[in-house]
Amino acid sequence: MTPLIIILGPTGAGRAATVRELAENAWPEGRKIRLLREAREGGAAPDAWEFKDGHAIVPAPGDEDVAILVTHGALHVVDQMEALHRTLKPMMPDAVWRVARIITVVDCPLAMKHKAVEEWYRVCVHFSDAVVINRRWEVPGQWVSKFLEPYEKEFYPCLFFNLTKVGAIANPPAVIDGEPL
């Protein structure tokens, strides 16, 4: 089975910078990484997956070592995740993809300005193994602490990372392989 990393987050949250950082720095040099963008957000992406009428259409693995699937940033995350689960059939013996990690990218200013977005993130974090905090420097530190508090208080089993102003993560391999404390 080919490992699949799923990226969640709204359009403009920093998903592209996170994907770039992971693709360039999370795996040993020479690994072939395939990027799967949702067809309507894909732009010039050579590969695409499609979410349509409640169904996910995901291409079969090729010769890549790992694939990164980016969900559509403007569509309902639960619907996409349920459709992906039905399509990928991770528990079935004939599954061709193995969901290795689910990563949410948080846009701090957007979440701070809109309570509904902050609640939307709670759904995403529920699914996630890792959370990348983006644009943290644009909001008060107290807001970030308050945002993270429920996850820390409830001992959410996911890792939290900061995406810096230059689009870097301190330890990219830990995002894909790290274990929560």
Protein language model regions, located:
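Glycine-rich P-loop/Walker A and Walker A-like loops and their local beta1-loop-alpha1 context
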Residues: 1-46, 70, 78
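Short, charged/polar "capping" segments at the starts of alpha-helices
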Residues: 14-15, 40-47, 77, 112, ...
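Conserved nucleotide-sensing/catalytic segment adjacent to the nucleotide-binding pocket
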Residues: 32-86
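Conserved Switch II/interswitch segment of TRAFAC-class P-loop GTPases
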Residues: 65-66, 70-86, 95-115, 136-142
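Well-ordered beta-strand positions
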Residues: 101, 129-130
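Charged helix-capping and loop-helix junction motifs
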Residues: 116-121
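C-terminal accessory "lid"/substrate-recognition subdomains
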Residues: 139-181
